[in-house]
Amino acid sequence: MKKFIIIIAALCCTYNASAWSRHIHAGIAAIAHDNLTEEAKKNITELLDGKSIIYHAQFVYDNADNEAYKHTKVWKNVAFTDKNKILKAKKAAKHENKDVRNAQALEGLISSLNALQSGGLTKEQTRDNMLYVITILSDLHCPTHYVFTDLLEKRKSFYYFNDKKYSYLTYWESNSVRGTFNWKTNEFVHQLSRKTPEQVADITNGSVTSWIIGNAPLYRSVYDLLNTGTRFDGQTLRLWQNKIYPISTEQVAVAGYRIAAILNSLFDSNAPQVKIK
Amino acid sequence: MKRLILTLIAILTIANITECFAWGRDGHATIAYIAERHLTPKAKENIEKCIDGRSIVYYASWLDNHRAEHKSWGKLSHVCHYDIHSFESIGKPHKYMKSTINKLKKYRELTDSARKVTIYHFVHSFGDYHCPGHVALYDRTGEKPKRIHTSSYDFYLNAKKSRWNYHKLWDAGIIQILHPDWGYMDWAHALDSSISQEYIDKVTAGTWEDWLQDVAKTTHTVYNIFNRVPKIKNAEDALDKDLSVVDGQMLNEFGEYASEQLLNAGLRMAKIINEIFGE
């Protein structure tokens, strides 16, 4: 029994280390898959040897220990100044804070998108770059991947529930949806893949870079939702979670639609084109 | 079964499950999803328009999640009371359900927010009232009504590692014991994929009052299973010597009842929504 609990706890820790947890990455990919055009779906399925993008929803994390992909280790976060301006990768790389040093996700995303758009890649390179885009664009709809240089201390925020200490960022990554809904992968689609064409147009309007910059003010405000050290009981935790799940579920949906838009743009010549910058 | 129970205990511990509500999230979502599968296109379109295009499943546990923000809801009775002989309804829950359904019937006259909240109440409470953990039976032949079976009936699962009670078993416990990995789509697929029209007609015949009375009769049968639960022999802890042990076979029987109630509640919920929103 004790062994069982330790194993599960260890698994939870592993998932926590990979930004959105595995079930959310799968949910986002499933929403994206649900919104692919037939042509894009056909081309992508061919690229993945018959599998869907859901299978590879967190490719970057699944291959974190592979030497060939070690350059993706700093493709974790995007850093912003106190004015919500993006901190360039070169500057971020020299920062004393590790989360800021790892804030080269936007550059990674852009380089993969540029490579895919320009063509001339092998099948394997095309597959890898597409799967980078899926993992990273998912993560860039998770507030914990936005490192605000003026709020670095707030990244250490924590709370107590029944006298046990929990990290706020880990809550976002693992429980911001699961704290309210026990959705399985297809259930994410049933619940969240139901935007109107007008809503989808609004979500996917602009360039990939503008999506990321546009997320920053909301994700900055997420830090206002917790006074570090707060002690929750069952009822106050529930009240607090009620403020969080509408944001997290909406971000999951938005990520899914935007991934679909960029994949349609890349793999269906008749689909609307999405600008990178 | 023993391993399954141990696994369940571990899952509940790790998940920090502190809230116990009828059926739990998965049960309520299953009922609402079964209902959704049986809605007419018109009814589905109309009810989803009222809740910002979302599925009714999204709001299946909204009442539990948001109860703390609306203190008055905590006072709503979530237990149906029945006479054990006549199965006549006694108490307030019927009045609450009647008022909720009456409000739904006039949904076009309600404000947007009142319409939404009424739908949230209905989708949740209708499921609650199909949960055997939310039925209390009384013998009224004496001077004072006597509650025959208490929902705080305590027992051990066969591993003797975990003390449970009747209410907790029905509040999510039984569903997670049966299929800890299933989501609401899995449950609906398993229960609702091959039912006959005859079954639907039979279960949805009559009024909602008849249906809840039917739940009360079922609950009586469930209570009777507990009556044949053996008491613990040679209990080490004298304080617990009267507790019973529910074994795997009994859990399977409870599972049958739970599955039947989830399905019936979904089919009946669909009938009411179709009647009101299908026009």
Report each predicted region and the residues it spans.
Chain B
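Bacterial Sec-dependent N-terminal signal peptides
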Residues: 1-23
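N-terminal, motif-rich segments that launch catalysis or mediate targeting to/interaction with membranes
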Residues: 21-125, 132, 137-279
